[in-house]
From Swiss-Prot:
UniProt gene name: gvpA
Primary localisation category: other
Organism, scientific name: Koribacter versatilis (strain Ellin345)
Descriptive protein name: Gas vesicle protein A
Described purpose of this protein according to its UniProt entry: Gas vesicles are hollow, gas filled proteinaceous nanostructures found in some microorganisms. During planktonic growth they allow positioning of the organism at a favorable depth for light or nutrient acquisition. GvpA forms the protein shell.
Keyword Nucleotide-binding found: no
GO annotation, cellular component aspect: gas vesicle shell; vesicle membrane
GO molecular function: structural molecule activity
Length: 98
């Protein structure tokens, strides 16, 4: 007698895709004490999400205010001409944002 598997479940790739798309947060707080004296206290918050999902929800709750985010503008470099009394030379290009 052969055993048949039902393929109605989710594969690992489907689960990972959903977790990265929606994101999950694991919030843990553990305290170990002996006779009323705290020996170890552990507080942890683990966020599992894609970068886009994290930034979208972190902006909504104001968590990205402390982090410097790079500007997503195009940088155009133009040469700067520096004129000296006796010679003329080209300095390093400066960076100008559009």
């Amino acid at each position: 007698m052969a055993v048949e598997r039902v393929s109605g479940g989710s594969s690992l790739i489907d689960v990972l895709d959903r977790v990265l798309d929606k994101g999950i947060v694991i919030d843990a707080w553990v305290r170990i004490s002996l006779v009323g004296i705290d020996l170890i206290t552990v507080e942890a918050r683990v966020v599992v999400a894609s970068i886009d999902t994290y930034l979208k929800y972190a902006d909504a709750v104001g968590l990205t205010g402390l982090v410097s985010r790079p500007q997503l503008t195009e940088v155009v470099e133009e040469p700067v001409v520096v004129e000296a009394p006796a010679t003329r030379r080209t300095a390093r290009p400066s960076r100008r944002r559009i």
